[in-house]
Curated annotation (Swiss-Prot):
Organism, scientific name: Escherichia coli
Keyword entries, A-Z: Hemagglutinin, Signal
Lineage summary: Bacteria, Pseudomonadati, Pseudomonadota, Gammaproteobacteria, Enterobacterales
Reported function: This protein is a non-fimbrial hemagglutinin that is specific for blood group M.
Name under which the protein is recorded: M-agglutinin
Record's signal peptide: 1-24
């Protein structure tokens, strides 16, 4: 928002106060509203279907598609996110039956996610198109693959997690 400040001054000369003439001034306040962007975020389940999960095995895919608006950048969060051990993994957890968890990571190798070692998915990592450092392309899905993080024994049942996407334009 841009505001122009107006200063009005007066002077005192030999005991006589003289007010400077004030002119009517129009102050214009401007605020830019970014275009509204709409997204669909879909989970495509890909396994594993057995209780013996191996490190790197595909767990599923997160498809983010901007359906309208000015192409935006994004920040993807997961409240159960962990600190990234390197630029190719953004780890997080799924909560399963009876409080059991499954650890997975978003594979950022050749994917639209931009993260470094030490980044935490709970705080958010940059996503978009390309390698995650360019805006989403309207109408084109940006796919992140989730893989099992370390060999795990899974309890049969449904596992859930939450992703939050915040977007902005440059």
């Amino acid at each position: 928002m841009n505001l122009k400040k107006i200063a009005i001054a007066s002077s005192v000369f030999a005991g006589i106060t003289m007010a400077l003439t004030c002119h009517a001034v129009t102050v214009t306040a401007t605020h830019t509203v970014e275009s509204d962007a709409e997204f669909t975020i879909d989970w495509v389940d890909a396994g594993p279907t057995t209780t013996d999960a191996k490190d790197g095995e595909v767990w599923g895919h997160l498809d983010m598609t901007q359906t309208r608006g000015t192409p935006t950048f994004g920040k993807l969060r997961n409240p159960q996110g962990e600190t990234s051990p390197g630029p190719l993994k953004a780890p997080f957890s799924f909560t399963g039956p009876d409080g059991h968890t499954a650890r997975a990571y978003l594979d950022s190798y050749g994917a639209p996610i931009h993260n470094y070692a030490g980044d935490n998915l709970a705080n958010g990592v940059k996503v978009g198109s390309g390698s995650g450092n360019t805006p989403f392309v309207v109408g084109t899905a940006s796919r992140l693959t989730a893989r099992i993080f370390g060999d795990q024994t899974l309890v049969p049942g449904v596992y859930r997690t939450t992703f939050e996407l915040t977007t902005w334009t440059d």
